[in-house]
């Protein structure tokens, strides 16, 4: 496999991990029927806020479903610890002066050159003396392989004790990182890797001889302090991956800070996060002293290419009839329909299936592998309608999605408009430079108020659509 895309190849390697049998979000089993509708045994009424996906599962889902490199045209912003020092970037791996075995491992994985963000990040991560780094890197930019390369570069194989420590929010994400280490380090057979995760039992008093330890914060903290399997004073590189996921998990933030405080002052600290909201930034500053900072400026999602409409209804059945009228009047390549609860989504998927539509259902009670399979089938066009809750409002790029329907408008836990979710939902259409269409179902004074506030927030007019008038529906498709 030869490719110019370092990050794409990394992600293909990561997505190739098959040992995902433990990725249960809930114990409940969900199976698609012959029509592609996924029917659940129990559909408890859950609010959108409760349905918002656990970040760790979402991160893992992104790794499994991504078949293309995230658009890498965005600008990289570099803030150096010492603004007077020269800013180095590289266009080839040879410039990094890697150990021959590591360079061989990089090429064996199919990489020809660094991606845009690594051009700046790798020289900092491999510099002497070591430099600390905080990097914003969304899923798909190849950051896992970048920090793996940094760890492997620092290890002295002859020293039989842990020298690099990597924290991941979950066992499954730690496993993804471990696979990349094994692949990149395969020409370094003397390099050893250990997983500090719950269930990995060691004898009390035992010392670990592996060079790199990957694990979850709670277990790593136990291994460093209570059980003393690891001598934290000998750690050279400390990586904190998925920081935004980490701080969303109760206890992980405090545990990570406690681990960091045990490390020597000259330990290299590397922190990665997909987002840089205030809570993540405060956390990063606590664990990474005197950092260089790299931010990948993200393309703003826009509503400019999306025509927005609303339909007035009095009940759930009227909303369904309006939906049927839209389908009867215009040709829809593929559509995504968002619901407020799992119960509504399950009902709607079944009703659409009865009408002869090829329907798939996606919700948070499914295991991650099932979700990835449903999304892939939708991407391939095997189902034309995807009914979902907020579980996949982000990150799914399907070129054929021409219509997004908000069967229920997105609100937060206090009943206020969730403008960000609205943007991400209808942003699934109008992509790749094409015109998109968004239809919002309004069934009460409250939801009309929500719609008006969304309209004011984005300063974009949302037109009324009469779905009883077929001529009017036909016009919106032009």
Curated annotation (Swiss-Prot):
Record region (Disordered): 31-55
Chief localization: cytoplasm
Binding site for ATP: 118, 137-144, 428, 431
Reactions performed catalytically: ATP + H2O = ADP + phosphate + H(+)
Sequence position, cross-link Glycyl lysine isopeptide (Lys-Gly) (interchain with G-Cter in SUMO1): 26
Superkingdom of source: Eukaryota
Region (C-terminal lobe): 300-478
Subcellular location: Cytoplasm; Nucleus, Nucleoplasm
Motif (Q motif): 91-119
Domain annotation Helicase ATP-binding: ranges: 124-294
EC number: 3.6.4.13
Biological-process GO terms, alphabetical: poly(A)+ mRNA export from nucleus
UniProt keyword annotations, A-Z: Acetylation, ATP-binding, Cytoplasm, Helicase, Hydrolase, Isopeptide bond, Nucleotide-binding, Nucleus, RNA-binding, Ubl conjugation
Top EC class, one word: hydrolase
Domain Helicase C-terminal: 305-473
Function: ATP-dependent RNA helicase involved in mRNA export from the nucleus. Rather than unwinding RNA duplexes, DDX19 functions as a remodeler of ribonucleoprotein particles, whereby proteins bound to nuclear mRNA are dissociated and replaced by cytoplasmic mRNA binding proteins.
Record text about domains: The N-terminal extension helix acts as an autoinhibitory domain, preventing ATP hydrolysis, unless the N-terminus of the protein is displaced by RNA binding, allowing cleft closure to bring key side chains into position for catalysis.
Entry's family note: Belongs to the DEAD box helicase family. DDX19/DBP5 subfamily.
Record protein name field: ATP-dependent RNA helicase DDX19A
Gene this chain is encoded by: DDX19A
């Amino acid at each position: 496999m030869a490719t110019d895309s370092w990050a794409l190849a990394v992600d293909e390697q990561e997505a190739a991990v098959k040992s995902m049998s433990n990725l249960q979000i809930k114990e409940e089993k969900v199976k698609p029927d012959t029509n592609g509708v996924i029917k659940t045994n129990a559909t408890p009424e859950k609010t959108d806020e409760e349905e918002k996906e656990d970040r760790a599962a979402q991160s893992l889902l992104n790794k499994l479903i991504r078949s293309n490199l995230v658009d890498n045209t965005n600008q990289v912003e570099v803030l150096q610890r010492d603004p007077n020092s020269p800013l180095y970037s590289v266009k080839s791996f040879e410039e990094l002066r890697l150990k021959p075995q590591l360079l061989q491992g990089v090429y064996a994985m199919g990489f020809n050159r660094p991606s845009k963000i690594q051009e700046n990040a790798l020289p900092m991560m491999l510099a002497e003396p070591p430099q600390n780094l905080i990097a914003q890197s969304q899923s798909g930019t190849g950051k896992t392989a970048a920090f793996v390369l940094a760890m492997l570069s620092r290890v002295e194989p002859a020293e039989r004790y842990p020298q690099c420590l990597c924290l991941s929010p979950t066992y499954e994400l730690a496993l993804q990182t471990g696979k990349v280490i094994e692949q990149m380090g395969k020409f370094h057979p003397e390099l050893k890797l250990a997983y500090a995760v719950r269930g990995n039992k060691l004898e009390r008093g035992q010392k670990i001889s592996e060079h790199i330890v990957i694990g979850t914060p709670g277990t790593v903290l136990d291994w460093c302090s209570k059980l003393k399997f690891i001598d934290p004073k000998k750690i050279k590189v400390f990586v904190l991956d998925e920081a935004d996921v980490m701080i969303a998990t109760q206890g992980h933030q405090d545990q990570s800070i406690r681990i960091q405080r045990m490390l020597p002052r000259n330990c290299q600290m590397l922190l990665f996060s997909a987002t840089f909201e205030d809570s993540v930034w405060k956390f990063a500053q606590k664990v990474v002293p005197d950092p260089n900072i790299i931010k990948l400026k993200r393309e703003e999602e826009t509503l400019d290419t999306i025509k927005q409409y609303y339909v007035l209804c009095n009940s759930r059945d009227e909303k369904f009839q309006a939906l049927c009228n839209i389908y009867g009047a215009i040709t829809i390549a593929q559509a995504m329909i968002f619901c407020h609860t799992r119960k509504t989504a399950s009902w709607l998927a079944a009703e659409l299936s009865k009408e002869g539509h090829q329907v798939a259902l996606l919700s948070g009670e499914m295991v991650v592998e099932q979700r990835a399979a449903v999304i892939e089938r939708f991407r391939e066009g095997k189902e034309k309608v995807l009914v979902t809750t907020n579980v996949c409002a982000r990150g799914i790029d399907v070129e054929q999605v021409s219509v997004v329907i908000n069967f229920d408008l997105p609100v937060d836990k206090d009943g206020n408009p969730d403008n960000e979710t609205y943007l991400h939902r209808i942003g699934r259409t109008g992509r790749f430079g094409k015109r998109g269409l968004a239809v919002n179902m309004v069934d009460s004074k409250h939801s009309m108020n929500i719609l008006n506030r969304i309209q004011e927030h984005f300063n974009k007019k949302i037109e009324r659509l009469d779905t009883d008038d077929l001529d009017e529906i036909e016009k919106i498709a032009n």
